[in-house]
Amino acid sequence: MSQKIILNNSYSITKSHLFHIVDPSPWPVLTSFALLLLVIGGVSFMHGYKFNIYILSAGIISVGYCLYSWWRDIVKEGIVEHQHTSPVRKGLQIGMALFILTEIVFFGVFFASFFKSSLSPVGLLDGVWVVKQGIWPPPTIKTFEPFDIPFINTLILLLSGTTVTWAHYALEEKNQKDCVTALALTILLGIFFTTMQAYEYYHAAFKFTDGIYASNFYLATGFHGAHVIIGTIFLIICYFRAKRGDFTTEGNGHLGFECAAWYWHFVDVVWLFLFTFVYIFGS
C-alpha cells in the first residue's frame, strides 16, 4: 500500500508502506553521553569533588538540550513530514505503555524496600543483622502528620487528574479554549504540588542519612517529585502546542497529549500509594 506524504507544502514523496523507517539521528548517542556526564556530575556533587557543580550543571544542560532536540524532531516527523501513520502511532502508544510499565516496576522496588524495612525492622550490629526493637518507624524519627501537607498534596494531584481529563475531553470536542485553560490549570497544580513538597522537605525533622526510614522516604517521595516535575514540563509543552493548534482529533492527531495524560495519571496513582503506605501506614 502506498501513501503520499507532503513535505513543507512544497513537494511530496510516496511511501510503499505505512511503517516508519527511522532516519539517522545523533540524539540517542549524544543523550547517552549527556546522561553519563550528568551521573558523573551527580556523584562528584555528592562526594564534594572539585568542580562538581560545574560538571553537574553541564550534565543537566546537556541532557535538557538533547531531549529537547530529540523530541522536536519527533514532533516535526508527525506534523511537518506526516510520518506518523496509524501503525507508527500504535507503536508509539505501545512504547509509552511499556515505559509506564517499567516505571511501575521502578517504584515497586521502593515499596518493596519500605515494606521489608517496616514489617521486619532490622539493622547491622558488628556485621550481623539483628532485630531493632521491632518498632517502625524508628523511635528517633519524627514522621510527618499525614493529614497535613501530604493530604493537601493528595487533593492537589487528584484535582490535577480531573483537569487533565477535562483538557482531553475538550480536545476531543474540538474546544481549543477549554483545552488550553484546563492544561494551564493542570500545570499550575503541578507547580503548586512541587512547591508544597519542597516546603515539606525543608521543614523535615530528619535527613536522608538518618537511617533506613529516612532513606526509603526520600527515595520514594523524591523520585515521585522528580516525575511530577518531568510531567509538568511534558504538559507545558502540550500547552504551547495546543495554543498553536498542533493537536487534532482526526486520526488520533494528539498522541503527544495523550501520552502526557497517561504519564500524569500514573504519577497520580503512585502518589495515592505513597500517601497510603508511606505517610499513613508509615506514621
UniProtKB/Swiss-Prot annotation:
- An example molecular function term from Gene Ontology annotations: cytochrome-c oxidase activity
Q: Which Pfam families match?
A: COX3
The enzyme class is: translocase
Keyword Cell membrane (UniProt): yes
Membrane topology term: Multi-pass membrane protein
List the catalytic activities from the record: 4 Fe(II)-[cytochrome c] + O2 + 8 H(+)(in) = 4 Fe(III)-[cytochrome c] + 2 H2O + 4 H(+)(out)
According to UniProt, the name of this protein is: Probable cytochrome c oxidase subunit 3
Q: Which organism is it from?
A: Rickettsia conorii (strain ATCC VR-613 / Malish 7)
